[in-house]
Amino acid sequence: YTEDQRGVAGGFIADPDVLDTWATSSLTPQIATGWGVNPDLHAKTFPMDLRPQGHDIIRTWLFSTAVRAETLASSVPWYNTALSGWILDPDRKKMSKSKGNVVVPNEVLEKYGSDAVRYWAASARLGADTAYDEGQMKIGRRLAIKLLNASKFVLNLGATEKSVITSQAQGRVLINALDRSLLARLAYLIEEATAAFEKYEYARALQICDSFFWSFT
């Protein structure tokens, strides 16, 4: 069809029930920051810092949002975009109900727990598709359990009142080689993990934290 056939016999008409969903969602940053409702909040929080989204809606949601912000405010809508990939099946094929390879989240959470699922999700890199891997969840569950047990062990050592611990620690110089090594490694870990998070490389932060914990257990 051509434009001159719109609304004429043998031509076409627009569907009156179609709504462009991006018309409203492209204003997400403005709406969330109180545009037109709370001027002070909007001035402090727009543009936003981060938009997390999938790579499949760059040409729709991201593009529409950027255009609206430029048109209405001569501004970018946010300063950073975190693009996630898709979750693929273990054979790295796209999940779909018709193929029968869809995973039900509730069943996974019931089996491994939320911390294990978070561990697996955090091991994925931004912009890259990730295969569903229960093996990683098992590793994450093992780490979560060990962290809990180690925390209980440490908290049960000696005094638990903060004031007592502080008074006992004042003026004490660590001379044990293992203690000094642990603190040096911890300082390095904090520096590296912080740098990774600043660059949104949370998979890197997870890896070095995981390595640090197991090296001292």
Question: Where are the language model's segments positioned?
Answer:
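Structured secondary-structure scaffolds
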Residues: Y1-G158, L182-T217
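Intrinsic disorder/low-complexity segments
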Residues: K162-L174
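S-adenosyl-L-methionine
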Residues: A159-K162, L178
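Aromatic-rich surface patch/π-platform used for binding flat ligands and interfaces
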Residues: I175, D179, L183
